[in-house]
Amino acid sequence: MSVVILGTGSCLPEKIVTNKDLEKIVETNDEWIRTRTGICERRIAGPGEQAYILASRAAKNALDAAGLVAEDLDMIVVGTISAHMVMPSCACMIQQEIGAKKAFAFDVNAACSGFLYAMEVGSKYVATNPAMKVLCIGTETLSARTNQQDRNTSIIFADGAGAAVIGYEEGDRGILASKLFSDGSFGDILFLSGSESTNTDLRLGEYEGSHIHMEGREVFKHAVRAMEGAVNTIMEEVGVSPHEIKLLIPHQANIRIIKNLGERLGLSSEQVFVNIANYGNTSAASVPIALDEAVRGGKIESGDLVLLCSFGGGFTWGASLIRW
């Protein structure tokens, strides 16, 4: 018996923002964005599309795929850094929205690695209690936390949600190995500050917004190296080689990062899933959205070896190897 993914789902906002649209807002152009990021367009949340709403829709799709209903869930764990409220948690709001009355729910903060962290936490619960059904989600509305005048971030970050339901099953398929890592010494390279609560000049009730800060070149260097190390560690532990991998689904951070990672791992372009052109970088939602798209697009079949990997602020990173 092993922990398996029973169903996946995703949800994207309706509004599409193209590179041409961004040319009207910030000093940039379509060619510059495409060549440096691989992004052509992205989805931006509008009214009524908060992180928990997008997540709830993704959750319902995942439950449908798993043949389950919300009342079957025992636990909800959500990776997010852009919930529109600090309290209650995004997970609790999702629990109420979908009607998962018996599930306990909480958030994890691991930035772009949030979904992998959520999956690891959820899988440990399932491993110790095989009857459990756990909903793991990555959801973000980072457009609201991005300085639209900063072309280093405004062209990259976008909104969306992805989900997976996990449980226990007999057989050989399932999560074969997972590894998570963190290094807080790089916290000043990629961060999203809070409400500036340390500013004593603010009077009660006042709020200063915060935006994502990213040193792109440093992030690139560390991201490729970290994800490569995590993936190699898992492949060595399980005893598989690159040619046995059907599909690598990496965090959709930047096309250069994705291509560089694939090359360093010795994978062909056909083995690396890419959808950043359509959705941009959706942080914690990136991997589950890509996973759901790959599943529904028929790119993954029963018995295939699938690798998930991600890297985010903290730094946080990790990888997971799954036999589908």
UniProtKB/Swiss-Prot annotation:
Gene Ontology annotations for the cellular component aspect, listed alphabetically: cytoplasm
EC nos: 2.3.1.180
Active site: C112, H251, N281
Keyword Lipid biosynthesis attributed: yes
GO BP, sorted A to Z: fatty acid biosynthetic process
Superkingdom to which the source organism belongs: Bacteria
DNA-binding recorded as keyword: no
Locations listed in the record: Cytoplasm
Keyword terms, alphabetized: Acyltransferase, Cytoplasm, Fatty acid biosynthesis, Fatty acid metabolism, Lipid biosynthesis, Lipid metabolism, Multifunctional enzyme, Transferase
Classification via InterPro entries: ACP_syn_III_C, ACP_syn_III_N, FabH, Thiolase-like
Listed GO MF terms: 3-oxoacyl-[acyl-carrier-protein] synthase activity; beta-ketoacyl-acyl-carrier-protein synthase III activity
SUPFAM superfamilies: Thiolase-like
Catalysed reactions, semicolon-separated: malonyl-[ACP] + acetyl-CoA + H(+) = 3-oxobutanoyl-[ACP] + CO2 + CoA
Biological role stated in the UniProt entry: Catalyzes the condensation reaction of fatty acid synthesis by the addition to an acyl acceptor of two carbons from malonyl-ACP. Catalyzes the first condensation reaction which initiates fatty acid synthesis and may therefore play a role in governing the total rate of fatty acid production. Possesses both acetoacetyl-ACP synthase and acetyl transacylase activities. Its substrate specificity determines the biosynthesis of branched-chain and/or straight-chain of fatty acids.
Annotated family: Belongs to the thiolase-like superfamily. FabH family.
Domain note: The last Arg residue of the ACP-binding site is essential for the weak association between ACP/AcpP and FabH.
Protein name: Beta-ketoacyl-[acyl-carrier-protein] synthase III
The encoding gene: fabH
